[in-house]
Amino acid sequence: MITSEEIKARLWNGSNELRGSMDASRYKDYMLGLMFYKFLSDQTLKTFATTAGISKEEDWFEEYKNAHQEYDTELEKMIQDILGYFVRPEHLYQTWVQDMNAGNFEVQKVTDSLNQFERSIAVTNGSDDFKGLFSSSTLDLTDTALGSNLNERNKNIQALIRLFEDLDMVALQNGDVLGDAYEYLIGQFAMESGKKAGEFYTPHQVSEVMAQIVATNQNITSIYDPTVGSGSLLLTVKKYLSEELQKSL
């Protein structure tokens, strides 16, 4: 599996190549948004495969599509009950990649996928957990900063999707590599953004001190960040809590 340092270098170098003149505080929304959507897609496939007893990872995508055709909303409900969300086959990150490989990728399909995810969450459990996560104000794929015309935006967005294409986000998350990479990217984007960084990032040294203070309390039932931007402070707190305590939150 790719190491923490390898993934940090790969993602940061990739972001520098792809973002062009776009401000770092803006580009982070696109990069981290698609990175998270890849995780949601991977987790959906992993959950389906585990439940269905499918061991060969290369079969998960096709088997999921076939199962969805047969069971439709029944399958969606099963995954929803386990994860709290689901991603339909036609909206999976893997489907975008498949379309790219076939030469029929359209940016609009990415927008449709992100919008459908939010709608499905709102309808199925009424939760606000994901509300606005992929809104057009955060991930505006028509933004001319991504390219002056549709073809250029199409090319740049495909390149960004390719950056996460072969990464197993579930495995990386289980090994804390994903969290480390996320924190690293947030920190790098913050340094690039200068004064604007205060809007979305608590300096890591401050997060460490706060996390260590909070973690001394073994009777924690909830943790809140009143000024949450990137969520990096909550990730830092998690590192100092026992696995048992993490599960109880």
Feature map (PLM): residue ranges:
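Non-catalytic, mostly N-terminal accessory regions of nucleic-acid modification and defense proteins
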Residues: 1-221
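Short, small-residue-rich loop/turn micro-motifs
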Residues: 185, 189, 228, 241
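Secondary-structure transition/capping motifs at alpha-helix termini
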Residues: 216-221, 242-249
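Class I SAM-dependent methyltransferase core
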Residues: 225
